[in-house]
Amino acid sequence: MRKRARIIYNPTSGKELFKRMLPEVLVKMEKAGFETSAYATQKAGDATIESKRALQEDYEMLIVAGGDGTLNEVVNGIAEHPKRPKIGVIPMGTVNDFGRALHLPTDILKAVDVIIEGHSVKVDIGKMNSRYFINLAAGGRITEVSYETSSKLKTFVGPFAYYIKGMEMLPQMTNVDVRIEYDGQVFQGEILLFLLGLTNSMAGFEKLVPDARLDDGYFTLIIVQKANLAELGHIMTLASRGEHIKHPKVIYEKAKSVNISSFEQMPLNVDGEYGGQLPANFLNLKQHIEVYTPKDVKNTELIQQD
């Protein structure tokens, strides 16, 4: 009996390239022995609903073609199910942080080849209150950039759109007084932003978490303490080289669980989408999701292989 695969794709991602190549992808999967069907999302939340339906239909594999937001929705659809299908990822978004972390090819047919080869690893995901994430959670005005940037601008200039929007928002940066509890430790004070990372790549910064491990059960907690615009600019420059962890205004820790609260409002970002406001409780779910990765790429700096 052939394995069944369900493709969940965002038809607007990647300048609609995947939609045009879908027939070729289906033929390739069928030739490889998979009974494959596809579903196109139309609005936010559709990928979550469809992935839950795919669980009820006992699909062995879900293939996600879209950006980090589409992948996040699929993860939220299957995370609470005891028998979760393996996930194949075809990176079609603007930045594709998760795809970068796993060294997935951006060429559609090469990404399909990775899935067909069948090499997979188990990776951690995070839970924030009642929702899940696979790449990062963050808080602070600057973290609004990813979901405040218009789709038209992203289509026109690609990842550079985030830098344009970020420069526009810099004058609006504010520090917020927070309490952060993590694995028995406590930080209390004013911060500009915090990041909780599961991978090494966030918003296109591939060295933001230079010692990332995708399956060790730990978040990387980055706290940028009260800072002015000049200090923030310096920290961001250092972050492009992975040297921000040495800056005196940066706290860099590993934690399995984190609780953050404040009497002030602080917007949250979950895998590039708006995640509400504080307070928030974060829990790392170790090796919770299984994903396909290139077998010829040594992820020694990222994945702890047995």
From Swiss-Prot:
InterPro entries: ATP-NAD_kinase_N, Diacylglycerol/lipid_kinase, Diacylglycerol_kinase_cat_dom, Lipid_Phosphate_FormReg, NAD/diacylglycerol_kinase_sf, YegS/DAGK_C
GO CC annotation: plasma membrane
Binding sites annotated in the UniProt record for Mg(2+): 213, 216, 218
EC number: 2.7.1.107
Positions of the catalytic residues: 273
Catalytic activity: a 1,2-diacyl-sn-glycerol + ATP = a 1,2-diacyl-sn-glycero-3-phosphate + ADP + H(+)
GO BP annotations listed: phospholipid biosynthetic process
Cofactor(s) it depends on: Mg(2+)
Domain (DAGKc): residue spans on this chain: 1-132
Cofactor note: Binds 1 Mg(2+) ion per subunit. This ion appears to have a structural role and is required for catalytic activity.
A GO MF term: ATP-dependent diacylglycerol kinase activity
One family name in Pfam for this protein: DAGK_cat
UniProt xrefs under Gene3D superfamilies: 2.60.200.40, Probable inorganic polyphosphate/atp-NAD kinase, domain 1
SUPFAM superfamilies documented for this protein: NAD kinase/diacylglycerol kinase-like
Broadest EC class assigned to this enzyme: transferase
Positions with a binding annotation for ATP: 10-14, 41, 67-73, 94
PANTHER family xrefs: LIPID KINASE YEGS, SPHINGOSINE KINASE
Quaternary structure note: Homodimer.
Function: Catalyzes the phosphorylation of diacylglycerol (DAG) into phosphatidic acid. Is a key enzyme involved in the production of lipoteichoic acid by reintroducing DAG formed from the breakdown of membrane phospholipids into the phosphatidylglycerol biosynthetic pathway.
Name of the protein in question: Diacylglycerol kinase
Source organism of this protein record: Staphylococcus carnosus (strain TM300)
